[in-house]
Curated annotation (Swiss-Prot):
NCBIfam families in UniProt: PPR
Keyword Ribosomal protein: no
Localization annotation: Mitochondrion
Protein's name in the database: Pentatricopeptide repeat-containing protein At1g22960, mitochondrial
Gene Ontology cellular component annotations, sorted alphabetically: mitochondrion
Keyword Cell inner membrane among UniProt keywords: no
Targeting presequence: 1-11
Signal peptide span: none
Family (UniProt): Belongs to the PPR family. P subfamily.
InterPro entries, A to Z: Pentatricopeptide_rpt (IPR002885), PPR_P_subfamily (IPR050872), TPR-like_helical_dom_sf (IPR011990)
Chain positions of PPR repeats: 167-201, 202-236, 237-271, 272-306, 307-341, 342-372, 373-407, 408-442, 443-477, 478-512, 514-548, 549-583, 584-618, 619-653, 654-688
Highest taxon above the source species: Eukaryota
Organism, as annotated: Arabidopsis thaliana (Mouse-ear cress)
Length: 718
């Protein structure tokens, strides 16, 4: 024992010969702060000090020249440091004069399986590194502490006796780690603690969390962080304002957008190129083309170089409203400015033409492109599939493979979706297998599409089998995959199992579902007639920090209309307008169709008029909804006039338009009109489907139907 003490004393003298007076003061400060040992007799205190000195000297003398931990260090050698966090803290403070070595040793300690973890030890290590500006190393230590679930470490930094500047430096670092790990809730908790105790986070960290909240669609919380910044004097930068503008556009809060850019002007913060592009893109996506145009002009007058990225949102905004002449006008402006349309520009046109049923124009545009890409083909394939033209989509797929363009996962997923929609689930499964031979492996979207197909077909056992295969392949289901399964359970009437899946998703992903998942869940509840639960979910969206969008409202409005609750639907529509959530063309379709189906044709036309007044351009769906109402009411002559009006407005009728007229003429036994309409469909290359044939021959016995279709088409072709 005496020999041991002599060795310890010798080690102590050796170590203290390298220390300075200032460092000794630091040691005293740290030993006092973290020590939880009782104040023992002098001999006990001396023995403890000798032990600390022994370990400190051992670490310093054996660390080696490498930046890596010494391979000769062993857990047996440092057993006491592994099991006694207080001793470890005191030893770390004794070697704080060599922070790199302290970090290497601490790193080594963390790799040992039997180490006893301590928040205080992590806090001590973080302070040593921060005092020496070793912030990269400090980041790794902070990340490790968070991975271990030591989220209360911020309490030690805030409430302990740390130097305030060092504490703020480390608190900012913890916030940075939280944002890098997308742990928005944990960030907000630390952020609020800091503010309450007078520790103001850096604007850089505030900007990062604003982006995380924006990307998570947690707009209410983003606004709260922004307001807190302003209230406590954290000066916002152009990045702050850009992020908030983007958040407000995504939430559809255009009134707040105006307040934010005016606040930028008031603070004399100059708009950047990014600011202008956010404003142009945001107003264009929300159909506010006059405002988008104004900021585009301001951008050019401010001397910023305009690029296709500045013009493309304008083109897309006009195209979404079917204003193709205005869109081509923007393209002419591009050319006059010496800027050539990009492949993305052409893809915008292809997508819009498909959306408006002008599939032949879209195909012609693709053929005229010098360098179409896989997105060009995928977009047109999707357009064909939406129109039920799977043969044309397959031929386009063959064209793609015949060229130098390689199909992507999106290509296969688009085709699989088309096969599922047409009920060809075996073909969809075969295409999934074919993908792997091309070294394109199914992803969560592939499997979810198949699950959705089987659910829609009522085959829940196969849906479950495909879902389980996805899990066996190690593919993690996303929110949409969980929701697709839940919708299947809802369709079978098992709402309890559906909500268990909801809880499983939250438990697995460790975060609340996003707005899309809530919208799909509300849709499923509406479809099974559970409006009370749907409304409950809609209100819950606010409580979890999300903002309902036009999709949320449209879904519940449809539920009310399908249940004949027209007043409740109108109230919800008015609430949308009060909240400055602008109804989309889908919202108006739901309102028009819901009233037309119930024989409330006058109200349906009122919504059509209101839609146009609000600058929302009708599409073939809204026109068909009115056409359906006229046919249902027996106003066949008015329906014909309306069909002509559609074509005059540049919206060509589709197979559903003709099918409704064919069906009503069959009811009136106007067979010449029926044949004329059917021939007109074929002449326009509008492919009749099963619905058309059922309408055409609904007064015949079922076994005569196929022969009559064959006879009619031979007659027309001759």
């Amino acid at each position: 024992m005496i020999l041991c003490l002599r060795l310890c004393l010798r080690a102590s003298r050796s170590f203290f010969s390298i220390s300075t007076t200032n460092n000794n003061n630091n040691l005293s400060r740290f030993l006092f702060r973290f020590s939880t040992l009782p104040h023992c007799a002098a001999s006990s205190s001396s023995s403890s000090s000798n032990l600390e000195s022994y370990y400190a000297n051992l670490i310093l003398s054996s660390h080696g020249d490498s930046n890596k931990p010494n391979r000769k260090w062993s857990s047996h050698q440092f057993r006491l440091l592994l099991t006694d966090p207080n001793l470890l803290i005191r030893v770390l403070n004794m070697i704080r004069v060599k922070p790199e070595i302290a970090f290497r040793f601490f790193n080594w300690i963390q790799r040992q399986s039997d180490v006893k973890q301590s928040r205080q030890a992590f806090a001590a290590m973080l302070e040593i590194l921060a005092e020496n500006d070793l912030m990269s190393e400090a980041y790794l230590v902070a990340e490790r502490s968070i991975d271990l679930g030591m989220h209360e470490i911020d309490d030690l930094l805030i409430d302990g006796s740390f130097d305030k500047l060092i504490a703020l430096k480390l608190l900012d670092l913890l916030l940075w780690v939280y944002t890098k790990k997308s742990m928005a809730e944990k960030f907000l908790l630390s952020f609020e603690k800091m503010i309450r105790k007078g520790f103001l986070p850096s604007v850089r960290n505030c900007n990062i969390v604003l982006k995380v909240l924006r990307d998570s669609r947690m707009m209410n919380k983003a606004s709260a962080v922004y307001e807190t910044m302003i209230e406590h004097g954290i000066m916002p930068t152009v990045i702050t304002f850009n992020t908030m503008l983007d958040s407000c556009f995504k939430a559809g809060d255009l009134e707040r957008v105006d307040k934010i850019w005016l606040e930028m002007k008031r603070r004399n913060i100059e708009f950047s190129e990014v600011t202008y592009n956010i404003l142009i893109n945001g107003f264009s996506k929300n159909g506010k083309m006059e405002e988008a145009r104004r900021f585009h002009g301001d951008m050019r007058r401010s001397g910023f170089a305009v690029t296709p990225y500045s013009f493309n949102p304008l083109i897309e905004g006009y195209c979404k409203q079917g204003l193709f002449d205005d869109a081509w006008g923007v393209t002419d402006e591009m050319l006059n400015a010496g800027i050539y349309p990009t492949t993305s520009t052409y893809n915008i046109y292809i997508c819009a033409l498909c959306d408006f049923g002008r599939i032949d124009d879209a195909r012609e545009l693709l053929s005229s492109m010098a360098a179409p890409d896989v997105v060009s083909y995928n977009t047109l394939m999707h357009g064909y599939i939406k129109m039920g033209k799977f043969v044309e989509a397959s031929l386009l797929f063959d064209d793609l493979r015949a060229g130098d363009i390689h199909p992507s996962i999106v290509t296969y997923n688009t085709l699989i979706d088309g096969l599922c929609e047409s009920g060809n689930l075996e073909g969809a499964q075969r295409l999934k297998e074919e993908m792997t031979t091309q070294l394109i492996f199914p992803d969560v979207i592939t499997y979810t599409t198949l699950v959705k197909g089987f659910v829609k077909n009522g085959n829940l056992s196969m849906a479950t089998e495909v879902y389980d295969e996805m899990l066996r392949k190690g593919i993690k289901p996303d929110g949409y995959a969980y929701t697709t399964r839940a919708v299947g359970e809802l369709r079978l009437g098992d709402s309890d199992k559906a909500f268990r899946l909801h809880e499983e998703m939250v438990a697995t992903d460790h975060h609340a579902p996003d707005l899309t998942i809530y919208n799909v869940r509300i849709d499923g509840l509406c479809k099974v007639g559970n409006l009370v639960k749907a409304i409950e979910f809609q209100r819950k969206i606010f409580r979890v920090g999300l903002v309902p969008d036009h999709v949320t409202y449209t879904t519940v409005i449809r539920g009310y209309l399908e249940n004949g609750q027209f007043k409740m639907a109108r109230n919800l529509y008015d609430e949308m307008l009060r909240k400055r959530l602008y109804p989309s063309v889908i919202t108006y379709f739901v309102l028009i169709y819901g009233h037309a189906k119930a024989g409330r044709l006058e109200q349906a036309f009122q919504y059509s008029t209101e839609m146009k007044k609000r600058g929302v351009r009708p599409n073939v769906m809204t026109h068909n909804a009115l056409l359906y109402g006229m046919c249902k009411a027996g106003n066949i002559d008015e329906a014909y006039r309306y069909l002509c009006k559609m074509e005059e407005e540049g919206i060509p009728p589709n197979k559903y338009s003709y099918t409704m007229l064919i069906s009503k003429n069959c009811d009136f036994e106007k067979w010449e009109e029926v044949v004329k309409l059917y021939k007109e469909m074929l002449d326009k290359e509008i492919e009749p489907d099963g619905y058309t044939h059922r309408a055409l021959f609904k007064h015949l016995e079922k076994d005569h139907e196929s022969r009559e279709v064959e006879f009619l088409e031979r007659l027309l072709l001759s």
